[in-house]
Amino acid sequence: MKKNTLFLGLVFIGILTFLVNLLAKTPFALNANLSALTIAILLGILFGNTFYPKISQYTAQGVIFAKGTLLRLGIILYGFRLTLQDISNVGINAIATDTIMLISTFLLTLWLGIRYLKMDKQIVYLTAGGCSICGAAAIMSMQPVTKAESHHVSIAVAVIVIFGTISMFLYPLMYPYLATWLNEHQFGIYIGSSVHEVAQVYAAGGNISPAVADTAVISKMIRVMMLAPFLLLVSWLLTKQNDQAKTTNISIPWFAFLFILMAVINSFSLIPAHIVAWIVEIDSLLLIAAMTALGLTTHISAIKQAGIKPLILGALVLCWLVIGGFFVNVGISQLF
């Protein structure tokens, strides 16, 4: 891998981000209600499975940096769009819903993958973590815990991105039909508690309204903050199963806590409004860049090599997230 792949990769991502912004302002995109993030993932997947592999050796480090570091920075700065009042308004509803969905999704995925589909346990554990918490970030965090092979990580990430991308389109389409049972606030919690990736949550909510997007992201960040204790629990369970006492490094999602810190700073107006407006603009570009990079690294070939079972698992879990998640959210909204 060449030393300048970080710089060239970031330049490449910057060009694609500029292109996405142009496409998002076209009449077609505006009439179809396609957000910049939705266009970014589609464009990324298209390029990632056509010409990008031919230039990946020159841009790989930059694309990986955008997919990881820029995504986390984008989520941290997203806190400047919110205040403590916004976070408190989500309330116990989001905490209860997120907890139920996390536990049920993880256990259901394990049962379907290991007991029903007879899949490789590493792939199933990684997929379960990605579906139940925060997508690729959770998968990457679980890799040292599960000792998973790199190609297993690629398969799990591909499944998450594919079905998370489907969710991005599905939830906005469902909203008009489910508005009778869930208002904007509740639908935001529904998205945040059941869509795979943080960026996908933002895209799905943003395709409905800014209010839904804000609530969805806050709800999602509650799930993200559950990652650290979740990893500790999974590590303990796997160690117990394997009868080992090896110490495993746990990846703590500090960006989730920094997200809250930015919201605190914004709540007390510690930064001038015109600077906050600039930060929000920069944040939008960071999220577009991260989503584009995520699409570029989604390789359809990895899914083909793994066979049909990962796709079946991803589809079954998506059905639970959409249908089961709806009933869980309706039930919780009736209780609180």
UniProtKB/Swiss-Prot annotation:
InterPro entries found in the cross-reference section: UPF0324_pro (IPR018383), UPF0324_YeiH-like (IPR004630)
Domain of life: Bacteria
Pfam family of the protein (one): Cons_hypoth698
Membrane topology: Multi-pass membrane protein
Residue ranges the record marks as coiled coil: none
Record carries keyword Repeat: no
Keyword tags: Cell membrane, Membrane, Transmembrane, Transmembrane helix
Entry's transmembrane regions: 5-23, 30-52, 62-84, 91-113, 123-140, 153-175, 221-238, 250-271, 275-297, 310-332
Compartments it resides in: Cell membrane
GO CC annotations, alphabetized: plasma membrane
The keyword Transmembrane is annotated on this UniProt entry: yes
Assigned protein family: Belongs to the UPF0324 family.
Family matches, as NCBIfam families: YeiH family putative sulfate export transporter
Name of this chain's protein: UPF0324 membrane protein PM1461
Native source species: Pasteurella multocida (strain Pm70)
